[in-house]
Every structure is written in C-alpha cells, then in structure tokens.
Amino acid sequence: MAGTLFIILRFVDTTLPSSRVYCVRSLEVSVAVELAAATVLAFESIGVVDDCGRSVLFSIILIAAFICSVFLIASEDIAGSRRSTGSCVTLWEGRNISFCLYRSNWLNTVPVGYMFFLRKNRSLDERYF
C-alpha cells in the first residue's frame, strides 16, 4: 500500500504544473474510500469477485477514485484567494510539489483536515494561508 501511494504521489508530482496550488479535501478522500468499498461489496454480493479478487478490485477502485478527486473534484487555485492562519506539516516532498497536511484555524472557510499539494518553492506562511 505504501508503494502504491508513493507511485501516485510521484505521478502527481510530475503531472501537475507547479504554478498552481491544488488541494484535496479530506471529505473527498473519505468519499473515495466509501465508494470503493461499496462497489466491491456490490460486485461480491452478485458473485462477480471472490475473496482473492476483492482486495485487488478495492485497490484499483480506490486509486482511481483518489486520482479523480485530485484532478476533477478538488483541484482549485487558492493562492492569494483565501487568507487564514494555520500550520502545514510536510509529509512528502517532490520535484514540483510537496504533499502537506494542513490544519487551519480559520474554520469558516477552510475546514480542519485539508490536504494540499503545494508548490515546493512556495513559502508556507500567512501570506497565502
């Protein structure tokens, strides 16, 4: 699972342009997990997959749902458009972007638990958050 996550992060790092700030809300991640689990259970209940194929199908659907949430659901340019204070912990640093867990103190606009794909050369200070 860790290897799969690393491959996804490397793909996103080399694909996304570094001139924008992209985010994935924790809500979309949880929806992706629930969608994958529900799909696997549906296929299993009608006899399409067995115990062996269940984990493979779940992994494929989860990865696809996560990639879709990154590129389609939650990508937005937030640089300069939102102001708040908070802290960002870098989880993984790539060539163009960093994968950070951001905890905001400004709960009215930016919920706690946002995960950001941030430009690597962007300073993480109150000018942007």
Curated annotation (Swiss-Prot):
Extracellular-side segments: 50-54
Source organism, top-level taxon: Eukaryota
Transmembrane segments: 29-49, 55-75
Keyword Membrane: yes
GO cellular component terms, semicolon-separated: membrane
Topology class, membrane: Multi-pass membrane protein
Keywords noted in UniProt: Membrane, Transmembrane, Transmembrane helix
Main location (coarse class): membrane
Residue intervals on the Cytoplasmic side: 1-28, 76-129
Compartments reported by the entry: Membrane
Other notes: Partially overlaps CMP2.
Protein name: Putative uncharacterized membrane protein YML057C-A
Species annotation: Saccharomyces cerevisiae (strain ATCC 204508 / S288c)
